[in-house]
Structures are given as C-alpha cells and as structure tokens.
A protein has these predicted regions:
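Sec-dependent, cleavable N-terminal signal peptides
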Residues: 1-18
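Short intrinsically disordered, low-complexity coil segments enriched in acidic
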Residues: 1-6, 113, 173-175
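Negatively charged
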Residues: 169-507
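Signature of Gram-negative chaperone-usher
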Residues: 14-170
Length: 507
C-alpha cells in the first residue's frame, strides 16, 4: 500500500488598493498539511480542509477575490517521484464523494460541490462585493481530495494564490442631505423674509439663482461646505447678494444629490430659475417638497435627470405659483409610492408633460393636481393606478380643465374619492369607463360645483361601502343627463341629494 506521508499547500496573497480606499486581507492558515496515510485508511478515503480569509476595506464599491494556482500546473506534485506521481485537479464540479481517485479541488462558502483548481492564467473569481466591509469580514474556503491505495509515497505540494483587489472606484462629490442643505444655504441670505401664514417660517426671498462656478471662491468670501460626509470632494457654496446668486463649486464634473433630498429648495421663494443638469439624481430616494413654496420659480430644466430610485415625490412642486411649463418626460417614476400634492397650487401651469410616468407603485394621489387652475388639457392615459388607495382632491379646483379621460384608471383599491373633481368648472363630460368603486367609503363633494357638466354616467359605481355622500352633486347646475344605478346598494348612506336645474331627488 502506498503511503503519502505529507501534503503541503503553501498560500500567498496579493493585495491591491486602488485610489484612496484601503484594503487589508489575511488567511488564517498559510501552510496546510494533510496526512495522506490517514486519508487512505479512512472509510471513504476523502478529506476536507477548511480555512478562512478575512478582508477589511473602506472601498465603497467593494473588492474582488480570486483564486489560482501559482503556475499553470494545477496538480499536487511529488517532486521526488521518478515516475512523476501527482494528485490531479478535478476537471468539473463534483461532490466530495464523487471525486475520482487521487484528485483534489476547492469550494467556497456553503457550496456543496468542489470546483477544479484554476491555473494562473485563468483565475477563478470566488467573491465580488459591492460595498465596504463592516469591519473585518471572514469567508471560508475548503480544499477537498480523494486518495487511493496506489498513490506513491512522498510529499505532494503546490501553491495557491488568493488575490484581493479593490473594485474600480470613481471619486464623487455628494451633496449633504436636503434639510441640511436647506438650512445651511438658507442662512447665506441674511435678509430673509417670513411666510405670510407663519411669521416664524423663514422664506429665502433674496436667493434668485443657484449656479455652478468654474473657479474656486476667494478666501475673502463667506464660504460654507455643503458636501455629505461620504463625499470625496468638497462642495463649496457662497452668496453674491448683488446678483442674488448662490454659487457652488466642486472639482467633480457633477454633484450626486443625496438619497434624502427632501426639502432641498423648500421655501426658496425668490428662486427664479433652476438648471438640474449639473446634478445627478441616480441615488435619490426622497424628493418630498423639493421645490415646495418656490413661488417665483419660472423655469426649471430636468433634461436627463435620473429619478429611478425615488419613492417619495410628495409636494415636489407645491405652490409653484408662476411656473407655466414643466417637462418631466425624463422622469423615471417606477418606484414612486407617494405623489400627493405633487403639483398642488401650480396656478399658472399650462403645459405639463408626464408622458414617461410609470405610476404602478403609487398608493397616494391626494391633491396631486389640486388648484392647477389654468391647464386646459391633462393627459393621464399612461397612468397605472392599480395600487392607488386615495384620490381625494386629485383633480379638484382645476378651473380651466375642459376634459378629462380616466377610463384607463384601475381604482379597485381606492378608498377615498372625496372632492375628486370638485370645482372643475369647465368640464362638460367625464369619461370614467368602468370605474371600480367597490372599496370607496367616502364620495362627499365628489362632483361639487362642476358648473359645465352636462352629462354623467355613474351607473358602474358600486357604492355598497360608501358611508359619506354629502353634497356629492351639489352645484352641478347644468346637468341634463345623470345615469345612476338605483340598485347600487347605498345601504350605508341615508340619503343622496342630487341638485339639477329642474328637480331635486332623493335616492
């Protein structure tokens, strides 16, 4: 019987750190030895030798770990053997018990199969991470082999190389979070005004422009830092009172906006125009009140702006009183859940491009277009409303809106439709299609003061769960055709008053 007296595996490692991030790595065993005689005398003639490697890196894009033999030779070689005895690498993935005699392989982590030993020219990627480690992080590798009685005695050795390389990383300029930006930049305007509704609320009345500077500010200027703690570059800002301009400067080509960019320009009531092309929104999750109360904002450019991760657009353009044209065709809203008050109070808006909107995840559309007084045509034919729960005031107070087609709306989850079309004075017909109202509990003032409405077919309405229909049709003074489903089961509503020019009827 052959005796393999000693098996030596010698490990070394290559560690590379790119750019400024740091990376350290270690292996808990650099010289693995196996008593071949014990393996051959065992029941299944196999053995597993686990060992750990530990990595610590602050690189934000993580690292890649690879494994290979030191040379093109992947076998464990008996250098004293005249016959060239060796333990070959397996050639395909196999479980330990299925390894051929006198072969070896490796496996990573919890894998059940062993893989062939890779040659130097074709290293195997065993792990690739996407972010920095949480302190020291360890992972396990295992060597497996199966030996046979015919193995020639001697020392069988090879060397494996574990390499750890920082993933490529591009230096970034990252803006501080929205509320912090708002507070810091707002204080640059030392002569702030105050809100008419609350004298304690500061309004940035003198900041009219926010622009990128191509040169660093002079040391004599009052300069603030507005970068996030994770930013690789400084972002400096200062205020030129004479022109009403907040300038910002960074060495990066673009500034990545913070994932929390809520309230970024909130209450910048003096802001007149904004170009977003120097900002990258790819990491933003929250844009709540982004431009809220920017009551003098007349122009904003969102061309190419990335909103793919945003979940909250609540009040994004709330009370933008003078903005007339808004093109959001570049917006990716596929992850947005909240759109309540998004355009509320845009009283001068006449053109709104929502052609790219994907609203499949939106749950709240309360006040979405409330008080958008001058727009005549609104195209929401691409809206996916299958998950919307609340549409209260959604289209209310759209004083100049002449027609509205929501026949594509899936309202099967909507619970609140109160005031939905209230004060829409110029709409003559509403196209509902087969609107599903089976979950709706309140329809109060739903069609209130739709003065021009001449015909309305709500025969598809299921009002079995409605508990409030107060003044649902109040002020619908020109209607001549109203189609109701009298068997609709308004059992939870005591009475429904319909007011028309010629009659009042209770159902």
């Amino acid at each position: 019987m052959a005796l393999a007296s000693c098996l030596n595996l010698v490990f070394s490692k290559n560690t590379f750190a790119l750019y400024t991030p740091t990376l350290s790595a270690s292996v808990n065993q650099t010289n693995l030895q196996v008593n071949g005689n014990s393996v051959i005398n065992s029941t299944d003639k196999t053995t597993e030798i686990p060992f750990n490697f530990t990595v610590n890196t602050n690189n934000r894009t993580g690292y890649t770990a690879t494994l290979s033999s030191e040379t093109e030779n992947t076998a464990l070689t008996n250098t004293s053997s005249a016959a060239g005895a060796k333990i070959d690498s397996i050639s395909t993935d196999l479980s330990l018990n299925n390894l051929p005699n006198n072969t070896w392989g490796y496996k990573f982590g919890v894998s059940t199969n062993y893989a062939p030993i890779p040659a130097l020219s074709t290293p195997a990627q065993i792990l690739q991470t996407a972010g920095k480690t949480n302190g020291n992080e360890s992972n396990q590798l295992s060597i497996g082999m199966k030996l046979a009685d015919n193995l020639e005695s001697g020392n069988y050795t090879n060397k494996l190389i574990l390499s750890f390389v920082s993933n490529p990383y591009t230096m970034r300029a990252v803006m501080t979070n929205g509320p912090d930006f708002n507070a810091r930049v707002g204080k640059l305007d030392v002569n702030t005004g105050f809100a008419s509704w609350d004298s304690s609320v500061a309004m940035m009345t003198n900041i009219r422009y926010v622009k990128k500077s191509t040169i660093r500010p002079s040391v004599s200027q009052a300069i603030i830092n507005i970068e996030d703690s994770d930013s690789d570059y400084e972002i400096l800002a200062w205020f030129d009172a004479a022109s009403g301009t907040v300038y910002y400067y960074t060495d990066a080509e673009k500034i990545e906006l913070n994932k929390n960019s809520s309230y970024l320009f909130h209450n910048f009531s003096g802001l007149q125009e904004m170009d977003m092309q120097n900002f990258d929104g790819k990491n933003i999750e929250n844009m709540r009140d982004f431009f809220a109360n920017c009551s003098n904002l007349a122009s904003v450019n969102f061309a190419g702006f990335n909103t793919g991760k945003v979940t909250d657009m609540t009040g994004m353009f709330y009370a933008n009183f003078v903005l007339k044209n808004l093109d959001l065709s570049s917006f990716d809203t596929s992850n947005v859940v909240y759109m309540n008050d998004m355009f509320s109070g845009m009283r001068e808006l006449v053109n709104l491009n929502l052609s790219s909107f994907n609203t499949g995840k939106v749950e709240i559309m309360v006040n979405m277009f409330y008080d958008v007084r001058k727009i005549k045509n609104l195209n929401v034919s691409n809206f996916d409303t299958r998950n919307v729960k609340k549409t209260r005031n959604m289209f209310a107070n759209m004083l100049e809106l002449e027609s509205l087609d929501i026949s594509n709306f899936d309202t099967s989850k909507v619970e609140d439709m109160a005031y939905m079309f209230s004060q829409d004075h110029k709409i003559k017909t509403l196209n509902f299609g087969n609107l599903n109202t089976s979950r709706v509990t309140t329809m109060e003032y739903m069609f209130q003061n739709m003065w021009a409405l001449e015909s309305l077919d709500v025969s598809s309405f299921d009002t079995s769960n409605v508990t409030n229909m107060k003044d649902m049709f109040n002020g619908v003074t020109k209607i001549t055709t109203l189609i109701l489903k009298l068997s609709c089961g308004m059992t939870k509503q005591r009475k429904l008053l319909i007011t028309t020019p010629s009659r009042e009827r209770y159902f």
